[in-house]
């Protein structure tokens, strides 16, 4: 499969199955899809199909380059991954290994974010804080179901996890104790809205948290429209100085500020750049996920503007980096030399089998987006996974089981 596009003055050709990316001149760009459709055409015939735009000699030279790339395995590469990926996903189902938990340490929140899928932290249920006992059992569940995997991920999530910070500290201590007993290693993450962030919490996070996620949407007016406090006032001025201190205290690494863009800020590149101007180097801003009926939901007609925003952002990031102003946008972190293995790229995030969410009372769901939806209740940390069909459905999902995905270059 070949995917071609023009961007920022470049002709870019992606050979999907090999992962090769080619930057070409006009004639090669025009010839590549033509030669894919007309495998046996001579160079003279190809020149004719190009309506005489190029001389036969030019076509011959370009076609030779294309044929060489094909021989090298970086163009027109066949898809040989389907059987391998199906075998990989089957193995995930038959021999499940849980690698990560999202611990809902608090089903309560001190903000009233309009787009929050957790419904003010309650997740379609009651306000609750996870007890130390449930949290310990969750960590033990992860150890017991992690197989031979050494490194395990735990995200303290909410609601707002700092509302139950004493239990967070106790669970980290318990996790460190269990590391020594089991030869496992926990990598903890704390996701926070920053309202309660103080020196004690920050010092603890810098000592124990592998990653710190700081929730802020960008410009003051954008953030405060969607992320008000319980009283209805804005949260921007409360959290910005705290987040700046947090980023600097971690030497601008192992954290990111995480925002959400909606129909009200389709010019979200301005929010990313605003955050950079405020001193943040690690930035993630993502599209809202919500009911299409919501006034802030992204519309089909927003797409051209949104796509252009990513181009604006790419150009500005390149410019700033050349000026010596480092900025890392999470969704541009694509490693062209390495990156995830092909099985992971084609089979998804691991929700429902490798990654699970745990409620304050110990129920298990495929991920935080499903918490509170009873049809996705897997079981609990005491009895384990009771509904085996849900992990099977999630685990077997991959690009090849979805007809539209199978045809898509992405």
Please give the residue ranges for each predicted region:
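Short acidic, hydrophobic short linear motifs in intrinsically disordered regions
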Residues: 39-54
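Conserved alpha-helical substructure of the radical SAM core
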Residues: 53-54, 60-69, 77-78, 83-203, ...
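A cross-family glycoside hydrolase active-site/sugar-binding cleft signature
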Residues: 102-104, 153-157, 189-193, 213-217, ...
């Amino acid at each position: 499969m070949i995917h071609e596009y023009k961007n920022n003055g470049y002709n870019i050709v992606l050979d999907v199955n090999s992962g090769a990316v080619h930057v070409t001149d006009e004639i090669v760009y025009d010839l590549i899809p033509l030669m894919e459709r007309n495998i046996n055409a001579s160079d003279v015939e190809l020149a004719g199909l190009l309506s005489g735009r190029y001389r036969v000699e030019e076509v011959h030279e370009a076609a030779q380059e294309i044929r060489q790339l094909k021989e090298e395995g970086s163009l027109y590469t066949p898809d040989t991954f389907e059987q391998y990926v199906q075998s990989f996903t089957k193995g995930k189902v038959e021999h499940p290994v849980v690698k990560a938990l999202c611990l809902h340490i608090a089903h309560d929140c001190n903000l009233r974010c309009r787009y929050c899928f957790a419904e003010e932290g309650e997740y379609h249920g009651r306000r609750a804080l996870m007890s130390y006992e449930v949290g310990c059992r969750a960590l033990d569940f992860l150890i017991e179901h992690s197989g031979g995997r050494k490194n395990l991920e735990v995200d303290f999530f909410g609601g707002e996890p700092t509302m139950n910070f004493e239990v967070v500290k106790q669970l980290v201590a318990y996790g460190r104790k269990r590391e020594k007993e089991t030869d496992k290693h926990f990598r903890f993450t704390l996701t926070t809205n920053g309202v309660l962030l103080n020196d004690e919490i920050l010092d603890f996070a810098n000592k124990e948290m592998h990653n710190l996620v700081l929730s802020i949407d960008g410009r003051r007016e954008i953030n405060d429209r969607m992320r008000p406090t319980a009283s209805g006032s804005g949260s921007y001025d409360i959290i910005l100085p705290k987040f700046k201190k947090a980023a600097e205290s971690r030497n601008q690494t192992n954290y990111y500020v995480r925002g959400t863009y909606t129909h009200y800020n389709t010019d979200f590149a301005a929010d990313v750049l605003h955050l950079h101007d405020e001193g943040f180097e690690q930035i993630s801003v993502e599209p809202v996920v919500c009911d299409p009926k919501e006034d802030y939901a992204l519309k089909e007609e927003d797409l051209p503007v949104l796509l252009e925003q990513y181009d604006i952002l790419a150009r500005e990031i390149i410019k700033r980096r050349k000026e010596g102003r480092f900025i890392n946008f999470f969704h541009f972190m694509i490693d062209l030399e390495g990156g995830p293995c092909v099985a992971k790229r084609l089979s998804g995030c691991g929700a429902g089998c490798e990654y699970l969410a745990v409620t304050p009372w110990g129920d298990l769901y495929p991920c935080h987006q499903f918490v509170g939806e009873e049809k996705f209740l897997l079981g609990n940390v005491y009895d384990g996974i009771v509904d085996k069909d849900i992990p099977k459905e999630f685990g077997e999902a991959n690009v090849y089981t979805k007809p539209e995905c199978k045809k898509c270059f992405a």
